[in-house]
């Protein structure tokens, strides 16, 4: 079964609202083996909706729309779709009573205009809205469109998501004849082209039902492996074989087989070994500490974070020597090492990670260009009392450079833990 998603609303076209609905719907469909062919956004003008509905029905078995189901004059989706198929309305008492009850719970009288939300397209399967006032509908057995389905849902994400999970997915699950299995292979410290070369042999001999998608992020790549077929056990077996072959090829660049951010993986490593970490950041401005503490339970391993942006702060807070700054500059491996060593000494943590660099857009030189970062690491006796630094250079704007600096620092911690 092929699906197309039509998101309706001028607010989407002008960028006022981000279209999260289409992403959610396509994920839900994928989980039950329904492939999304296209995602389209159209204006809430009648001719735009009509043209797109006709076009989508000519290509897909299932068309899902969101938006335009409210009680105001510009909410016209229900009328346009009913007129398109030459269908009338019928009154759904349950939907109307739900709407009245919602206003009553809020201590408000229901406006007369909301009575229209009890009207549904005749012959439709009504999708009750447990979080709002507008019911959804599934249209089937449509004149001139035998075997086609149209799903109409509200545009409010909070309402649509519940309707999709509770009503739409269970309705269409029996209609799908395919099983789909996905695995995300999360890598760090490797670029897309290098990874493609490394797994080239596996890619060349992929079974017909399996595909690979390269999804690059800051300093690594998420490799999505997908397998599809009509026999559940065969899909599972084929998928496992492909994943195992890829894991063997990727080697130490692989850190997870689920959609897990690097900071979560590092948190698991630290927690499992009873280790703590502290940060001393200059160019990343606390981003590493922020990422580590975004993970629930991070208090078990995150000790403290310093943001020492100025040279004076590096000297006072971390004990970086003035002589080091004078001789090598703030952006140097020597300074990064002293920042990490000072952080380790002051916190007593097991690992200290530091960053000092040039995020841009200004401040770069021929020797120290924009995008250069020096990352320092210091460890306690538990990890061999090590102290070292590494220089890396990226090419991006200021915010993306900061993101890449933080990712590179976290990956250095990962490599350290894996080697210890």
Swiss-Prot record:
InterPro entries: CinA, CinA-like_C, CinA_C, CinA_KH, Competence-induced_CinA, MoaB/Mog-like_dom_sf, MoaB/Mog_dom. It holds the Pfam family CinA. It comes from the Bacteria. Belongs to the CinA family. PANTHER family: NICOTINAMIDE-NUCLEOTIDE AMIDOHYDROLASE PNCC (PTHR13939), NMN AMIDOHYDROLASE-LIKE PROTEIN YFAY (PTHR13939:SF0). HAMAP family: CinA_B (MF_00226_B). This is CinA-like protein. It comes from Chloroherpeton thalassium (strain ATCC 35110 / GB-78).
